[in-house]
């Protein structure tokens, strides 16, 4: 889980509300780059499948639409006291995920602390950092890059 401000100078989560399903979140570590894709926003199975089939492999798209991740939304607005979003698999099941999920958390609406905006994404790939830097990554929309010092 990552939490950050979305307003003010240098706010890393300023554009979090513009994320769409399948947008990339990149985590650059010392030796690897992890690419996460934002999960579907809808809670309807058919819509979740159509939103995820364009970016995930077929097995993951099925898990996202009707399987173990069917109740994990890619975008959610919650109140500050809804601490269950900190759970590794925030669907109320108490299960541990067997695929990596990432949660981004910030204040909502902008310039307010009344609610929290939550974005969730599933791990898409882990690549050698040197090889990753040699190629161009296509972008289908907004994305987020987080680097390790």
Walk through the language-model features, giving the residues of each.
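Extracytoplasmic/periplasmic soluble domains downstream of a signal peptide or transmembrane helix
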Residues: 1-149
């Amino acid at each position: 889980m990552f939490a950050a401000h979305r307003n003010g100078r240098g706010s890393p989560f300023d554009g979090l509300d513009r994320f769409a399903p399948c947008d990339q979140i990149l985590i650059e570590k010392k030796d690897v780059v992890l690419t996460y894709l934002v999960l579907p926003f809808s809670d309807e199975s058919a819509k979740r499948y159509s939103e995820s089939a364009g970016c995930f492999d077929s097995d993951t798209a099925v898990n996202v639409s009707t399987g173990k991740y069917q109740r994990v939304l890619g975008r959610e607005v919650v109140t500050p006291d809804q601490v269950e979003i900190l759970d590794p698999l925030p669907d109320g099941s108490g299960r541990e995920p067997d695929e990596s999920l990432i949660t981004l958390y910030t204040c909502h609406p902008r310039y307010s602390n009344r609610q929290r905006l939550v974005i969730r994404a599933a791990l898409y790939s882990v690549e050698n950092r040197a090889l990753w830097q040699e190629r161009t990554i296509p972008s289908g929309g907004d994305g987020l890059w987080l680097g390790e010092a």
